[in-house]
């Protein structure tokens, strides 16, 4: 075996998290050596692929699970404000990156699409009105509209209005300033910036082991997945941004911070169409209420997507199940992740999360026609022949130890970092990609605590609101929002997005990384 390749920073996984961290570190430490290892042959081919996620600029504008009703009927907006604040940090960094040549093609990853909450039934419409009243006084949500008029509904959402019985009340919370994000294109542009500035990229290579030496550095053994050839990398800092593959690698590293954590994989499926008549009549990301007792991941939504400059509609998600932690993972991922330190946590979840298990079983039993019937709650005129099933990505929900329960399932993202700051990783899913920038700021602050103060002036140049809650600073919010809107071209509609043609859509097929390039 050849001499170890030495690097200051090793990034494992070529998705949005590693891509974001690589760009941030390159901007504050231009002389550091960096190496990226990715097991697949292309960047952003797992959860960051646009076909593997909803592409919502996840800012809590339309996701109703972030605004629960309290027992007295009032609306708790705490989580919605927190998620939106995080998205604002990402949006400001993207603005800086576009201005400074880090992201050369803004329209390929970001498009203006309204974000809409949708409910039916008198009680739900009343809830939506209370939600609007609670949110609209916050500067971050000030442009939200409340709509319960059927004519206005039909004007804005003609596809959803067709054949709808408006004797059943309808309600919308409409925010014009939403976005559709292609996190695959965004990841590739960020990684391209890193590669242009000296980052070594090793695609088709997999981490097989990692151990920490007495000097605090990490010896990481990797293998070429095509040839089997092995090589060694010596890294001062390791970031594991491997999506569902992060937990097994952090377990291999043996850091105590990962002990007790488990993962529960949940697959996803979408109905999709590229029918030009349908895409022309639905230009919004519309989120509804989850079925009673269903987990947050089950929130149904009918989305406009812009992928490779083509317009699509997606509806879902429908849950699938596989023991794989990655879409292109191994069936042994789940069983091999069970360790003595997390066995109690994982068994505890199996006993306490009966609602999730019931939901998954119900989803797995759905027929094709039953899925389209669910779609008709949103688009009553939907025809089976217009829609096809597409397999989305795997998400691994975090299982954490909990006193008295064994373990609890968490719906969110968790940064794990070793006490010495030499290794960190990201676990979990939603809100995920949209909060990549604040998540990576957290990694930088925790793992480079000695350097972070010297980075802050540069980071504040990238994100003017850093350390400030924009909801408490309406003037600053107006300034950064207006500037970002102009730089990111969000004041210009995604004009003349061509619809897909029949031969560009193949029913029942998964999109390979090469084909979808994300």
Swiss-Prot record:
Enzyme Commission identifier(s): 1.1.5.4
Reactions the enzyme catalyzes: (S)-malate + a quinone = a quinol + oxaloacetate
A GO term for molecular function: 2-hydroxyglutarate dehydrogenase activity
UniProt pathway annotation: Carbohydrate metabolism; tricarboxylic acid cycle; oxaloacetate from (S)-malate (quinone route): step 1/1
Record-given protein name: Probable malate:quinone oxidoreductase
InterPro entries, per the entry: FAD/NAD-bd_sf, MQO
Ranges of Polar residues composition bias in the record: 497-509
Cofactor(s) the record lists: FAD
GO biological process: tricarboxylic acid cycle
Family: Belongs to the MQO family.
Record region (Disordered): 497-518
Keywords recorded for this protein, A-Z: FAD, Flavoprotein, Oxidoreductase, Tricarboxylic acid cycle
Native organism taxonomy: Bacteria, Bacillati, Actinomycetota, Actinomycetes, Mycobacteriales
Domain of life: Bacteria
Cross-referenced Pfam families: Mqo (PF06039)
